[in-house]
Amino acid sequence: MSHTHHPRPCPIPVVVATLLAAFFCSTEPTRAQSSADAPQRSIRVELPGQEQNAIKNSWPGISCWFMTAPDFEPDGFKRFIDLHSSHSGAGLLTTSIRHNVEVTQPAVHDQIKRAAVYARDHGLGVVMDLDVRLARQAFMSKYPDEMQELVCLREIPLTSSGEVTLSIPSIELSDHYTPGASGVRPYGTLSTRLLAAYSAVEGADGIDPSTIQDISSRCRILQADTNCLRVAIPTLPADAGRKAFILAAFTLFSPDVFAPHLIEFERAILKQYADVPLAGACKDEWGFPGRFAPRLDDLYFTPAMALEYAHRRPGHDLARDLLLMIKPQLGREPERAAAINHYMEMNWQRNAAVENAFYDSIKQVFGPRAMAATHPTWFPHPETREEVFKNGLHWWAARRDLAQTDEVTPFSVRTALAKKSHSPIWMNMFYDGNLATYSGELWRHALGGGRINFHPVYPPGANSPTDYLTTSLLHGNLMTADCRIRLLNFISTAPIDCPVAIIFGHPAALNWAGPGLADTGLKIANALWEQGFYADLIPSSEISSKNLKLATDGSIQYGPQHYAAALLHHPQYERPALATFFRKAAALRRTALYRTGEWTRDFEGRTFDGATALAGMKSLSPEAAAGEIISHLKSLGLQPQTTCTKRDGGFPGSMMPLPSGQCRLLDGTVILASGATDVMGDPIQKTIQIASHPVRFDAVGIAAIRLDKSGKVDALAAGALRSLSAGDLQIELTSPVDLALWHDSHGHWQGVLQGWDGPIPEPLARITTHWARLRLPAPVDQSPR
């Protein structure tokens, strides 16, 4: 079983609670029946400094489980759980369904309950995906008028006589929730309607707004079904030189993001599973149905969205404003910018509201310490149109206790989300088609302040075994190496230190009327990370939500991070209140302030003198910004961390740490990690200086230490430790040991030995008798250690 280890001032560490007790306040902890000397497969310890987080304990390992048809056979779930209980160090399974069933079906509920009970009894907690997208048919049956629409604007020249016809093909979208190979229905077209039709004169610079006419009533519907919308328009002599602009609305097999009953329906799903011993619930990659290479003349729309838009902008009609957003109109550039600003802000705020309602429901149904999973990122890069139109870059506003991302999300985003969540680490769901890639990623993640949520190898090779998705990560030493790295979790109480904030203009990054669409300043962040000066990437909307704020010492602060420097990128279309924030920051002079990009219009499209409003910020070109900031950081005596290399392939490039180097956490922990040549780690025989105190390590893979203000050791973690010299703490071991050692809240030493048989080594027993033991998983063809 997996247990929670509660340090206390007693001669023997007490290991208490099942996984449920670790997450659910409603479940009382129970004393383990086994001896304290018996190795456990997972241990969680209470961490200091977690007042801002609902989760007070260290995080266990996390792996993905995708339930397919075999898992829904009687006892079919046991194979995956048995394998991962024996051959991984995971304590949690973020679990979703890749099968043609819905979570609202009683038989599915019952199978998931059996699986969750079995997993719990084998030391694993199931965090189940209970998103509405796994119950689309049930939602549509109950609320048939609350499905998502996508409006496609297409145009055709009109003639002076006769009739013109235009056919607009239907839409079919899909993602990981709609695996076609498993027979799951895509986000296909359910029905089609003509939303509106306009005619106007359009020149090279845009439509002449004085010529716009609503010609919806002139249109004759020839076909409106799941295949297309086809309309005929009788023409008139006055139509010569004009164009028709047809807005076709396709209703998709997906709930409307703005559906009035969406949040209520998802809450009911969670309540349906209240009797299941889940460790939490997942909502993965939420947003509108994702579109690859999205067109700027296709925009999401529903009557519920139109109502919200009218509420935000009295006197404005969303259907009419869609024409303005898509097609520039002469002399209406400010109005167009404002319409897009409101539309996109409305969208990302609604996506965040749905996410946060789901978070609240998880806590209400499963308890305050239940896990809210997984990641809000989809096409995981802030500088892609795919992500912009999927969710409006709402990532920072989606509440989590553990910062979570996926795939190749830039490290500057991962670290920022850790600050927002007040989580000591971030977790990134990673996959690749090559198993060898995971080895380097494991160490890169650690040096960037994070860990991997292990997604199976994907896509599997053509000749892979049928159960490769189940077993692909359990061969070799990958899982064992992850256990070594996760020794850091016992002593990491705060996220990685990033002294720079790159604050990108959220409106500009979402607005295609200006030059800043999908430009979040990542190139500047990359240039900083490349040199080892880490930066958090944060949207400007976090200022208006009062999450990015001025600290009591006058510095700009995000979660636990105080910034030595902050750069505002592309403030175009911001509200004037943003300037007030930076004027106050400039007056306090605790954070160096920089700006890239012009600010000539505010959120409503009105003329704005940003240069004067931001006079306290040094204006730089994007090319010069990183160098200027690095010079300032060096003048403060700040040292770089692990340098980075660029990741390319499939997404805009972003920086990732080398697999060998050094980083520092905000709690003062210094981490050395090295895994460039061996997945289990490379030798670390090194002396470092921490505030003039020398520390010498002889270890493998990881060597981490935190000193108190007097220079005494407060916590340490190391792989295959042979020796440590740090002030009055001297350790010399005849055999290498994986260990973590820390002071509990009473000031007493507590420790964990991993993969160690036999008596506690005498040098360690002299430090404390409070040692717990962790079992090491063995590769799938070996026995556990």
Language model feature labels by segment:
Residues 1-10:
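N-terminal secretory signal peptides that target proteins for export/translocation
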Residues 14, 29-30, 675-676:
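Extracellular/secretory pathway and lumenal proteins
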Residues 5, 19, 28-31:
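N-terminal compositionally biased, intrinsically disordered segments and leader/signal-like regions
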Residues 13-25:
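Bacterial N-terminal signal peptides
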Residues 26-289, 361, 498, 632, ...:
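Mature N-terminal, pre-catalytic/accessory segment of carbohydrate-active enzymes
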Residues 38, 71-73, 78, 92, ...:
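Carbohydrate-binding surfaces of carbohydrate-active enzymes
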Residues 10, 24-29, 596:
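Compositionally biased, intrinsically disordered or flexible polar/acidic segments
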